[in-house]
């Protein structure tokens, strides 16, 4: 069995899905977390992310990293 984490960061939210992948190709999702980041609404006049947007994204990624550690993830795909 391999433990896989998939991270998707979109314009409105970030999601972490952790699954167990078995040798026969079957999988079992064991954790799913979604955080509303609203990045599309947090840009400055030059269309760059604000410092607050970057800070909240970093905090979310720290939370995701912690969960990956708890679930002893073998591989992360982002």
Where do the language-model regions lie?
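Short loop/turn motifs at secondary-structure junctions
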Residues: 10, 31, 72-75
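Short, well-ordered amphipathic alpha-helical segments that serve as non-catalytic structural scaffolds
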Residues: 56-67
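Generic hydrophobic secondary-structure packing signal
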Residues: 53-56, 74
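Short glycine-rich, Thr/Ser-proximal phosphate-binding strand/loop in the N-terminal lobe
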Residues: 14-51
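Short beta-strand-loop/turn "lid" adjacent to the catalytic site in phosphate-handling enzymes
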Residues: 66-78
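Short glycine-aspartate micro-motif
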Residues: 4-8
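Conserved phosphate-binding catalytic cores of ATP/NTP-utilizing and phosphoryl-transfer enzymes
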Residues: 1
């Amino acid at each position: 069995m391999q433990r896989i984490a998939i991270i998707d960061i979109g314009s409105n939210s970030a999601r972490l899905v952790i699954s167990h992948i078995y040798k026969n190709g079957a999988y079992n999702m064991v954790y799913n977390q979604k955080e509303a980041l609203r990045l599309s609404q947090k840009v400055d006049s030059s269309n760059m992310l604000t410092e607050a947007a970057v800070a909240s994204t970093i905090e979310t990624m720290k939370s995701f990293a912690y969960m990956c550690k708890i679930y002893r993830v073998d591989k992360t795909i982002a």
